[in-house]
Amino acid sequence: MALGGGTFTSQNKELPGAYINFVSAASASAALSDRGIATMPLELDWGVEGEVFEVTNEDFQKNSLKLFGYAFDSPKMIGLNDLFMGAKTLYAYRLNGGGDKAANTYATAKYCGVRGNDLKIVIQKNADDTSKYDVTTYFGTVKVDTQTVAKAADLVANDYVTFKAADLAVTAGTPLTGGTNGTVDGTAHQAYLDKIESYTYNTMGVVVTDDVTKKLYVAFNKRLRDELGIKFQLVVYNLSADYMGVISVKNKVTDTGWSEAALVYWVTGAESGCAVNKSCQNKKYDGGFTVDTNYTQNELKAAIKAGEFTFHKVNGVVRVLEDINSMVTTSDTCGDVFKDNQTIRVIDQLGNDDAVLFNTKYLGVVPNNASGRTSLWSDLVKIRTQLQELGAIEGFTDSDVTVAQGDSKKAVVITSAITVVNAMGKLYETVTVA
């Protein structure tokens, strides 16, 4: 069972855990966890089915053919290349599993998918021992495995095929055929969400254009952020979500064979990898897609007001206009500062790190007395001090954190004030000319 978490309005929670609210300051109107972790459900021609699988940036560059069916520099991998421009680790899930595996007389593809049809088996007599055969597996034009055996039963499955108990015979190349991708529907998306709920990551991205699927992911994001205390941001394409946890990408890509929503790959990676003391504002788009930036100045202003994460062209270079989320409606406790993704990175860092600290070090272990609360206070101060040293917050002092006993003997109430530092975004300059 997961520990309790999320926000609170009164001290009446039943599950043990950390419940944390972030509110705006009144106005006129232990260790920090790493970033760079993203998750995405993907439509693939090859790969693991029915499970979340972890891929690091290094894995992608070295093992892309084995993992995804194409070399990392293939045009088919532009999206994932964009993602790994910013992300260090991806928790991937294949949406279109459940299809047919390609096969021939000698072997069956390891995974379903149309890419399995590019496998072939070459069998030759061994030059040194004619009683044996050299059995070679090709993936496209790439030789991926060779084994020398006397009979098929001696063959060992490799990363691409499993072998059948067939009589070996010389062949210049017998292709595998019949591989198909599975279908993608709401059930596939829900299966991914069910699997990924227990993982920890900074951003989730989904490359879809229909509002029904987008709203499924928004509901998931809101439930985990607000009810379970699992802080992450969701990146979608062209949706007015009006929520700090959702980033809505305005621009489309114009590349043939790709969804117009494909910029979600790059934004998901960039936001996951952006340091807690940094911003993506004015960040150069260094990905592989052609971005539609055909907007007037007035349209760009309107996009900011609408909470749209927008790219624009500056001196021929595509850059991020503002590092904002989709939130547009403000209140006394949730002001304009929460529209900025740098603010969300800071509060998500605090929310996640405070919860991990409490749930792993204090929950059920440390007594709720003056000494125990002082220890918790000290650890909370350390986390905020580290953020201040990084330049993510400013003006923090020890007195900005208080830890007190709650309404019950087991409850602890923490009050914490922070001031988030945001990157420079506007320059107002007056020049006096003599």
What are these regions (language model features)?
Residues 383-390, 419-423:
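Hydrophobic alpha-helical segments
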Residues 402-434:
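C-terminal edge-of-domain segments
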Residues 70:
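Short gly/ser-rich anion-binding loops that grip negatively charged ligand groups
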Residues 2-23, 29-48, 52-56, 60, ...:
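A glycine- and small-residue-enriched flexible loop/hinge signal that marks low-structured segments
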